[in-house]
Amino acid sequence: MNPPFKVHILGCGSALPSKSHNPSSQIVEIRGKYFMIDCGEGTQVQVRRSHVSFSKLYAIFISHVHGDHVFGLMGMLSTFGLQGRIAPLHIYAPAHYEELFLMEKKMFLSTMDYDIIFHPLDTTQSQVIYEDRSLTVETIPLQHRVPCCGFLFKEKPTRQHFLRNTSLPRPLVPLPPIPVRAYAYCSDTRYIPTLGEMLRSKCPGPLTIYHESTYADDKKDNAGKYMHSTAREAAMVAKSADAQQLLLGHYSHRYADETLLLNEAQEVFSPTLLSQEGEVYDV
């Protein structure tokens, strides 16, 4: 049986406040490790509601420095210190954020008893930024109004396993390899026609994609103007990537009911879901 590989949705709204959604944030749970992606305002409250322990977070990945993706970071890091965290925490974020982050760290976190290690990212190229025995995390260059990248979480292949059957001439029978699962977080970006093909080339096994879907077709001009994507465009990426499933998110506040977004995406790629706060999705 495959070990857990899950995505916890903490926030799936966009920049303007909404009664129904929180700003962007997710937790990726893989093989007992927990990684946060983006940290919009109020994220630490959502973590409490998710029942994921603060102490289990190893690293935080920031896709870009817009407030709805980063305004919750300092408050949460301060809470970690108040809780007595001593384990180091790794922050991966676009390089131009480092100067401001260090200023905020000096002002708000100077008395904390745990180390915070900042890893500056080059958002213009794909590169492996984290690796352990079972996992790699790679950047996905995106196209937004500020430097921005997504993140590709991918399992490493496991060693081949054998089934012992003493009734056969050759008692060790090789078992089929376990498919390598992957999760692609595609944050704020305009539609990139080559993105799906790139993901398909990197992910031969089951692939789940989260792709921003700020607008429906009725606001496609806004998507182009503000460098966002429509739900249909997100589905085009998933179809091109031959993905297993697509999670929509980053909904504009103008849509009180996101069913319109879902319907337009499913016209192109049927295994599409509306991500929702509090939901946990298997990869």
Regions found by a protein language model. Give the residues of each.
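Active-site metal-binding motif and surrounding structural segment of the metallo-beta-lactamase
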Residues: 41-92, 120-122
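Short, surface-exposed connector motifs at secondary-structure boundaries
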Residues: 31, 57, 83-88, 240-247
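Active-site neighborhood of phospho(di)ester-bond hydrolases with catalytic His/Asp-centered motifs
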Residues: 37-40, 57-65, 69, 94, ...
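Metal-dependent catalytic neighborhoods of phosphoester/phosphodiester hydrolases
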Residues: 73-80, 256-264
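Metal-dependent phosphodiesterase/nuclease catalytic metal-binding core
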Residues: 27, 122-249, 257-270
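Conserved beta-strand hairpin/beta-sheet module of binuclear metal-dependent hydrolase folds
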Residues: 2-50, 86, 151-153, 160, ...
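Active-site neighborhood of divalent metal-dependent phosphoester bond hydrolases
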Residues: 85-89, 95-122, 254
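General small-molecule cofactor/ligand-binding pocket signal
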Residues: 8, 92, 117-122, 138-140, ...
